Amino acid sequence: METEVPGIFACGNVLHVHDLVDWVTEESRKAGAYAAEYVLSGCKDSSSDEVIHTVAKNGISYIVPQRLRKDNLQEEIILYFRVRDIYYDRKIVVKNKGEVIKSVKRRHLAPGEMEQVKIKTELLRNIDIDELTVEVSEEV
């Protein structure tokens, strides 16, 4: 993932603490691919690109990545996060302007376990979007 400094990419525990080395490996592959794409594009400055901000809401401590470039979305977006408390039988809800984009049931959530939610990019096409919120919600 590209940092706020153009051309500097970070992954693994430098970015945020991971529970599984598998996720570090997956993230490092992505960071390497993005770094290669950056170099092959002639080190194009992306600071003026349109972005989607990710915002932690009710029960969520943080989300990675914090920004997604609209013109560089892959087939699937993976948001990594940790919850603030221990929860049972809840939903992770991703919203755009109050409208639910995705909802995933979880039996157990704990701050010590990194969570992730995968969102198909096709769900974001043809809608006005500049912010995705993620929150813990009561299961219905």
Cite the ranges covered by each PLM segment.
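Residues forming the flavin
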Residues: M1-V140
